[in-house]
């Protein structure tokens, strides 16, 4: 499935719009605790472990969004937007959301 942040796909005609699709994932507080405990792997101001968890959360949200689009019969998602937001009473969890428009493009 083609996934893009742009509202069109150059050289392709959109033949059907299905509407908004989304995928979400939440990283719990225990993950943050584990990450901060391993803060020793920071190199140049970056934490490789933290970045890997964020990358996995993003990938999960995108996969859920694509699965929802596939169920509708779409073969692409356009206008994709990723959002990161803290949730929970003390902001102890991070939610990653992927949103876009499910479409069918010509082959």
Swiss-Prot record:
Pfam families (alphabetical): YbjQ_1 (PF01906)
Coiled-coil features, chain-numbered ranges: none
InterPro entries assigned to the protein according to its UniProt record, in alphabetical order: UPF0145_dom_sf (IPR035439), UPF0145_YbjQ-like (IPR002765)
Domain of life (superkingdom): Bacteria
Family annotation (NCBIfam families): PRK02877.1
Family: Belongs to the UPF0145 family.
Name of the protein in its database record: UPF0145 protein BT_3410
Organism field: Bacteroides thetaiotaomicron (strain ATCC 29148 / DSM 2079 / JCM 5827 / CCUG 10774 / NCTC 10582 / VPI-5482 / E50)
């Amino acid at each position: 499935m083609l996934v893009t942040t742009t509202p069109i796909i150059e050289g392709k005609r959109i033949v059907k719009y299905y509407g908004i699709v989304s995928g979400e994932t939440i990283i719990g507080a225990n993950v943050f605790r584990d990450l901060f405990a391993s803060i020793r792997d920071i190199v140049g101001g970056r934490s490789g472990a933290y970045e890997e968890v964020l990358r996995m959360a993003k990938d999960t949200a995108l996969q859920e969004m694509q699965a929802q689009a596939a169920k509708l019969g779409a073969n692409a998602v356009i206008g994709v937007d990723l959002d990161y937001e803290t949730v929970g009473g003390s902001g102890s969890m991070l939610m990653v959301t992927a949103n876009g428009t499910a479409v069918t493009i010509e082959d």
